[in-house]
Curated annotation (Swiss-Prot):
The keyword Phosphoprotein applies. ATP binds at residues 74-82, 106. It comes from Arabidopsis thaliana. It is a lipid-anchor. Keywords: ATP-binding, Cell membrane, Kinase, Lipoprotein, Membrane, Myristate, Nucleotide-binding, Palmitate, Phosphoprotein, Plant defense, Serine/threonine-protein kinase, Transferase, Tyrosine-protein kinase. The lineage of its organism: Eukaryota, Viridiplantae, Streptophyta, Embryophyta, Tracheophyta. This is Probable serine/threonine-protein kinase PBL9. Its EC number is 2.7.11.1. Residues 68-352 form the Protein kinase domain. Its main location: membrane. A lipid is attached at residue 4 (S-palmitoyl cysteine). It catalyses: L-seryl-[protein] + ATP = O-phospho-L-seryl-[protein] + ADP + H(+); L-threonyl-[protein] + ATP = O-phospho-L-threonyl-[protein] + ADP + H(+). Gene3D superfamilies: Phosphorylase Kinase, domain 1, Transferase(Phosphotransferase) domain 1. GO terms for biological process: defense response.
Length: 410
C-alpha cells in the first residue's frame, strides 16, 4: 500500500515502479512459510490504541477534501486515490481550502487488492511510532466499508520524482542534498531496526522516501512492514513481497526476512542516488538494465567509479567522498549477509561522508578533475554513438527512458 503525499505525484512516468502496484509474488512453496491472515475486521477492535491518532468520520474527511473532488487528487493507484485537504491545526476539524493544516487523505478502494490488512498495518505501525524520519500519520477513518488514512502533507514529494524526472524545468538533486536524503532515510531505518522497535520495513525504495520542504527524508508506506524476529530466532519466514530490483537475493530465494534485507534495499537506493539511474530500467541496453549488476564491477575499481556517478553532479563532490559512498553501497549489497553493516553503522558512515563534504566544500584536487574529465569524455562518446545509431535507423530517440522497475507479482 503506497503513500503518495505530494502534489508532484502526477509527474511520475506511467512506466515507473510506483508505490501503487501489487507487491505480492505469493508463496514460495517449501522454501517459505505463508503468513496466517486473520479475517478483516469491521470494527476498530484490531487497531492498537494510540493517543497520537484521531478517528475521523467519513463526513469530516469528505468536507476536508471538498467532497473528494477530482482536482484535489494528488495521486492514484491500486489502493485507490490520495486527496489533498485542509483541517484546523488545533481541533483537527475540516477547514476552508487554503487555511489551516494541509493534509493528504488516502482513500482505499473497497475492492482494492491491497486491502484491509495493509491498511491496518499502516495504522498500527505509524500510530505507535513517532520519529522525525517517519511520515506522520494524523488519523484514520474506519466507517462501514470506508478505509481512509490521514497524513501530513509532504510538499516536495518523493525521492523518486526528484531523482529521475528529466527536463528543462527540473533541477537535479545536488550531491549535498543526496547525502542529506540518504542520511535521513538511514536514520529512519535505524530507528525501525533498534531494539526498542524491532521492525523490518520490507519495502525500502525511492518512491517510499518522501521529502518535506527542507528535503528531510521521511519513510512512508508501512503496509508491508513486519515485526522482527524475537528470542533466539534469526529471521521471520513469510511470503516474498516487495519490488523487483530492491529485494535482497536471500529473501527472494528463501522467504527469510531480517533487518539485513532492509540494508540490502538501502544499498540499492544509495546506488540510485549515486548514479541517477533506476534499480531496474528495461529501456536501457541489456547489460545495463539491472543497476546493481551493471555497477558493481565499476564500484570496485577506484579509476572507474566515475562511470557510475551521475554526470549531472559535476564538481560537487571529491574523489574521497565518491569512493566512500561507493564502498558503503557495496557493503550493503554484498550477498554475504553477515558482512552487511547494520543501519546504525550506515548512519555513522554517512555522517562522516557528509562532514567531509562540508569540510571540502565541493573543491577537488587536480587528480579528481582529470579523472572527471576523462570519465565525462567516455560518457559523451557513448551517448553520441548511441544517438547516431538510433538516428541512422530512423527510430525516435528517447532522451530520458521510462523507468521499468516492477513490483513482485504472483
Amino acid at each position: 500500500m503506497g503513500i503518495c503525499l505530494s502534489a508532484q505525484v502526477k509527474a511520475e512516468s506511467s512506466g515507473a515502479s510506483t508505490k501503487y502496484d501489487a507487491k505480492d509474488i505469493g508463496s514460495l512453496g517449501s522454501k517459505a512459510s505463508s503468513v496466517s491472515v486473520r479475517p478483516s475486521p469491521r470494527t476498530e477492535g484490531e487497531i492498537l490504541q494510540s493517543p497520537n491518532l484521531k478517528s475521523f468520520s467519513f463526513a469530516e474527511l469528505k468536507s476536508a477534501t471538498r467532497n473528494f473532488r477530482p482536482d484535489s487528487v494528488l495521486g492514484e493507484g491500486g489502493f485507490g486515490c490520495v486527496f489533498k485537504g485542509w483541517i484546523d491545526e488545533k481541533s483537527l476539524t475540516a477547514s476552508r481550502p487554503g487555511t489551516g493544516l494541509v493534509i493528504a487523505v488516502k482513500k482505499l478502494n473497497q475492492d482494492g487488492w491491497q486491502g484491509h490488512q495493509e491498511w491496518l498495518a499502516e495504522v498500527n505501525y505509524l500510530g505507535q511510532f513517532s520519529h522525525r524520519h517517519l511520515v506522520k500519520l494524523i488519523g484514520y477513518c474506519l466507517e462501514d466499508e470506508h478505509r481512509l488514512l490521514v497524513y501530513e502533507f509532504m510538499p516536495r514529494g518523493s525521492l523518486e520524482n526528484h531523482l529521475f524526472r528529466r527536463g528543462l524545468y527540473f533541477q537535479p538533486l545536488s550531491w549535498k542534498l543526496r547525502l542529506k536524503v540518504a542520511l535521513g532515510a538511514a536514520k529512519g531505518l535505524a530507528f525501525l531496526h533498534s531494539s526498542e522497535t524491532r521492525v523490518i520495513y520490507r519495502d525500502f525504495k525511492t518512491s517510499n522516501i518522501l521529502l518535506d520542504s527542507e528535503y528531510n527524508a521521511k519513510l512512508s508506506d508501512f503496509g508491508l512492514a513486519k515485526d522482527g524476529p524475537i528470542g533466539d530466532k534469526s529471521h521471520v519466514s513469510t511470503r516474498v513481497m516487495g519490488t523487483h530490483g530492491y529485494a535482497a537475493p536471500e529473501y527472494l530465494a528463501t522467504g527469510h526476512l531480517t533487518t539485513k534485507s532492509d540494508v540490502y534495499s538501502f544499498g540499492v537506493v544509495l546506488l540510485e542516488l549515486l548514479s541517477g539511474r533506476r534499480a531496474v530500467d528495461k529501456n536501457r541496453p541489456s547489460g545495463e538494465r539491472n543497476l546493481v549488476e551493471w555497477a558493481k564491477p565499476y564500484l570496485v575499481n577506484k579509476r572507474k567509479i566515475f562511470r557510475v556517478i551521475d554526470n549531472r553532479l559535476q564538481d560537487q563532490y571529491s574523489m574521497e567522498e565518491a569512493c566512500k559512498v561507493a564502498t558503503l553501497s557495496l557493503r550493503c549489497l554484498t550477498t554475504e549477509i553477515k558482512l552487511r553493516p547494520n543501519m546504525s553503522e550506515v548512519v555513522s558512515h554517512l555522517e562522516h561522508i557528509q562532514s567531509l563534504n562540508a569540510a571540502i566544500g565541493g573543491n577537488m584536487d587536480k587528480t579528481d578533475r582529470r579523472m572527471r574529465r576523462r570519465s565525462d569524455s567516455v560518457v559523451s562518446k557513448k551517448v553520441n554513438a548511441g544517438f547516431a545509431r538510433q538516428t541512422a535507423v530512423g527510430s525516435t530517440v528517447v532522451a530520458y527512458p521510462r523507468p521499468s522497475a516492477s513490483p513482485l507479482y504472483v
